[in-house]
């Protein structure tokens, strides 16, 4: 099968969209499929992004920054995208978290008569609210409906996302979750030297991993930074870092980590907290659980499918999140081992090969649907 992936975000930007696309590329190549990636270039004034990734051609389009919409550059589609796709001759077009560039990819796919699978991964309407643009939420949903209703199939990563899409009259929605690297994220990566570096006096470590952007609501962890009986660690980087370093003056900020360093950071935490409620899936929750770390998250969005309350972690009411957080952390620190073992066990069947095989099944389904239409 020849698969063209139109990715709204890709390397050198590292986030949930990029990471899932990288996993899909790897699995497709390992299973004998051919792949083309269409993705944003770096903004003007920055070094150009790679045109080849692991042997796969990456066609780059110009990008622009839209600070009132997202902290990431957005790809601007060009008419020649049709020619790029025609030259590759794909069997299916995979739209990864489509927005501006994804819409261009969808238009090109429809023009060429190629079936498309749109992966809903970013809650743009929720993000708009986080950026102080509540009025834009309805417009964001109108755009999402306009785009996804034209795809042959929309894939949502969680029950909450499926319900949200259905409530906004988006058709042909199916479930496709995310895998986790259970050999990379492991409890045995716990590093006592790293823990002493973060917390020299041995206080329990509570951590967050993710992009430091308004929609993540990392500032809600201020109620923990004020405590003298634990150490807060923030892993990641982004536009809010300077502000958060002021709001969380006692926290350790590591910057962005990858690979073994990221695995060690997860496993070296005693409790993982994700404070934002606009996650369609929340991959960092799953990675923390694979690392044997109990999780606290809002009772909203993707974490509802991932966290089993009072077994693998705790889900807190969104409106009372900050009030309930200190007691929840204290409870999980006391019961860390029991919760951590259960958290690890809960993700062992969610490997990337299994999940990516499910994705190929969705590709085959839209190909079959198109064949039936033609007949």
UniProtKB/Swiss-Prot annotation:
Assigned GO CC terms: membrane
Pfam families (alphabetical): Glyco_transf_4 (PF13439), Glycos_transf_1 (PF00534)
Swiss-Prot/TrEMBL keywords: Glycosyltransferase, Lipid biosynthesis, Lipid metabolism, Phospholipid biosynthesis, Phospholipid metabolism, Transferase, Virulence
Gene3D superfamilies, alphabetized: Glycogen Phosphorylase B (3.40.50.2000)
One term of GO molecular function: mannosyltransferase activity
One BP annotation, GO: glycolipid biosynthetic process
Disulphide linkage map: none
EC number(s) on file: 2.4.1.-
Pathway: Phospholipid metabolism; phosphatidylinositol metabolism
Similarity field: Belongs to the glycosyltransferase group 1 family. Glycosyltransferase 4 subfamily.
PANTHER family listed in its UniProt record: SULFOQUINOVOSYL TRANSFERASE SQD2 (PTHR45947:SF3)
Biological role: Catalyzes the addition of a mannose residue from GDP-D-mannose to GlcAGroAc2 to generate 1,2-di-O-C16/C18:1-(alpha-D-mannopyranosyl)-(1-4)-(alpha-D-glucopyranosyluronic acid)-(1-3)-glycerol(ManGlcAGroAc2).
Protein name stated in the entry: GDP-mannose-dependent alpha-mannosyltransferase
Species of provenance: Mycolicibacterium smegmatis (strain ATCC 700084 / mc(2)155)
């Amino acid at each position: 099968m020849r698969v063209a992936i139109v990715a709204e975000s890709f390397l050198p930007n590292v986030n949930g969209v990029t990471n899932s696309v990288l996993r899909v590329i790897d699995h497709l190549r390992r299973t004998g499929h051919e792949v083309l990636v269409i993705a944003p270039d770096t903004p003007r004034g920055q070094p150009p992004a790679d045109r080849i990734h692991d042997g796969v051609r990456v066609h780059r389009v110009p990008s622009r920054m839209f600070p009132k919409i997202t902290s990431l550059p957005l790809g601007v589609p060009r008419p020649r995208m049709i020619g790029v796709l025609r030259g590759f001759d794909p069997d299916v077009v995979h739209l990864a978290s489509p927005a501006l560039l994804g819409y261009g990819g969808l238009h090109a796919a429809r023009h060429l008569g190629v079936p498309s699978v749109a992966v809903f991964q970013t809650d743009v309407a929720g993000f708009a609210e986080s950026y102080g643009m509540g009025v834009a939420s309805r417009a964001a949903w109108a755009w999402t409906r306009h785009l996804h209703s034209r795809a042959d199939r929309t894939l949502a990563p969680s029950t909450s996302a499926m319900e949200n899409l259905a409530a906004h009259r988006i058709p042909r929605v199916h479930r496709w979750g995310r895998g986790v690297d259970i050999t990379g994220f492991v409890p045995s990566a716990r590093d006592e030297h790293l823990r002493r570096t973060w917390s020299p006096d041995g206080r329990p470590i509570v951590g967050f991993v993710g992009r430091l952007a308004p929609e993540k609501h990392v500032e809600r962890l201020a109620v923990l930074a004020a405590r003298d009986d634990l150490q807060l660690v923030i892993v990641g980087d982004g536009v809010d870092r300077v502000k958060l370093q002021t709001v969380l003056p006692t926290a350790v900020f590591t910057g962005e980590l990858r690979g073994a360093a990221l695995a060690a950071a997860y496993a070296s935490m005693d409790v993982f907290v994700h404070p934002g409620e606009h996650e369609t899936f929340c991959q960092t929750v799953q990675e923390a659980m694979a690392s044997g770390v109990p999780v606290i998250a809002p009772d909203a969005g993707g974490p509802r499918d991932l966290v089993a309350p009072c077994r693998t972690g705790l889900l807190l009411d969104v409106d009372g999140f900050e009030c309930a957080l200190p007691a929840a952390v204290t409870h999980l620190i006391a019961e860390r081992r029991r919760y951590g073992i259960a958290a690890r066990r809960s993700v062992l069947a969610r490997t990337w090969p299994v999940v990516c095989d499910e994705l190929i099944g969705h590709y085959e389904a839209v190909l079959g649907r198109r064949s039936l239409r033609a007949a």
